Amino acid sequence: MKFLLYNIRYGTGKYLIKRFKHIRGYLGRSEKHIDRIGKFIRRQKPDIVGLVEVDLGSFRMKSKNQAEILSEMTDKNFIYQYKYEENSRYMKFPIVRKQGNALLSNKEIVNHKFHYLDNGMKKLIIEIETNGVVIFLVHLALGGKTRMKQFVQLFSLIEKCDKPMIVAGDFNTLWGTEEIELFMKAGKLKSANLERKPTFPSWSPKKELDFVLHSKNIKINDVKVIKTMLSDHLPILIDFDII
């Protein structure tokens, strides 16, 4: 079975413009670029896909939902959720309120839950069960102290799971991978990326921000950090078996 993790940066591509690169790139149209991302995903032939930073219908996409488009392009079931809770002040802003994360699967998504952590701006956790495995898709805060609080709460979610499990996403471990090691030890999780290949930025990878962690009843057969410039992050593709 194959699982692909990819922070797609709302389909706006990597930083292409030197001046005001972050703002102009963030606001860029993404309708054409999302087609390239869909074709890339299709070529990898994953069974399950975890997508971080998905545009769910802002002006960048002319109100079209990237999760729906990618599910159609890859012929998969899908589930998505907005990053911010309904009563959050961030939901008042036109672009921000259409930002979210999504999961695609070639099999039925039999259960799903949306968890919002207590701290931070980035605090959505999507939990699904599909293909005999439970997936937790995360995108953690940029602030280190906030991340530490989020790790504690994330652990309280995963410790209740007694099924084969993958915890994957953009953990934003800007302080280094050491900050995730205590969480992994407490949760009895291993990283699929044993060589600690960096995933950010895509054009000159220096930091390992994206992780695919797994429980002991999952055996990793192969892992690839794929070099592609479709986003500012590199995708991770794993081949695994449930044992």
Question: Residues of each region from the PLM?
Answer:
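N-terminal, active-site-proximal structural segment of metallo-dependent hydrolase catalytic domains
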Residues: 1-73, 80-83, 88, 243
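Active-site beta-strand/loop signature of hydrolases that rely on acidic residues for catalysis
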Residues: 2-7, 36-61, 135-138, 154-181, ...
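Active-site environment of divalent metal-dependent phosphoester hydrolases
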Residues: 11-12, 56-59, 86-88, 143-146, ...
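Residue-level detector of structured alpha->beta connecting loops
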Residues: 45, 75, 106-108, 162, ...
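Structured beta-strand-rich core segments of catalytic domains in phosphoester-bond hydrolases
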Residues: 53-132, 224-227
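Charged helix-capping and loop-helix junction motifs
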Residues: 63-68, 149-155
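Metal-dependent phosphoester-hydrolase catalytic domains
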Residues: 114, 129, 156-166, 171-243
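Metal-dependent phosphoester/phosphodiester hydrolase catalytic core
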Residues: 128-133, 138-145
